[in-house]
């Protein structure tokens, strides 16, 4: 099967791509940065998901995973509008198996910066919209809304001992997720799962 994943050059997106490659899938990655994966079954395109004119014409994908995201002045344009643009271009067709959004706990809790929270909240609503539209094709659409994940992006948090201790006091398992665990969830929701759809899963 063919999988499209955005934001594959680092962090969660890279881990998801590596998981699907390990399982024998053909993976296409979109990222503004150069490829950090070198495998025969991996194809990489350097592009900005905000610019639809950069989107390549590609054969239909079985699975589309929207992972690309930022936390800056481009929150709405990338996290929400970019996710919508990618999905509309590659995820809405009669052979689609699954569309997955990588959301955020902030979309549920309202924490973080206003624009970021709004962008992720929009993704939660759009997930339900897509689920209804691809259900007639047997496709599913869900979002995985992670809290703390051990990525380079979160180093300012994990390396601040006082802040980290405060977070761990509120965390029952006393740790954050690894990127490999996020990849396992992504694989389960798009490959193993064939019935759950339209759900925003807070982890």
Region annotations inferred by a language model:
Residues 9, 17:
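N-terminal Rossmann NAD(P)H-binding glycine-rich loop of SDR-like oxidoreductase domains
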Residues 175-203:
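C-terminal substrate-recognition "lid" of short-chain dehydrogenase/reductases
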Residues 145-156:
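Short, flexible catalytic-loop segment of classical short-chain dehydrogenase/reductase
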Residues 18, 84, 121-128, 132, ...:
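Conserved active-site helix of classical SDR/Rossmann-fold NAD(P)-dependent CH-OH oxidoreductases
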Residues 67-72:
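Conserved NAD(P)H cofactor-binding loop of Rossmann-fold oxidoreductase domains
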Residues 135, 140, 196-199:
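Short, small/polar-rich loop/turn modules that mediate ligand/substrate recognition or access, typified
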Residues 98-122, 127-136, 148-149:
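Catalytic loop of short-chain dehydrogenase/reductase
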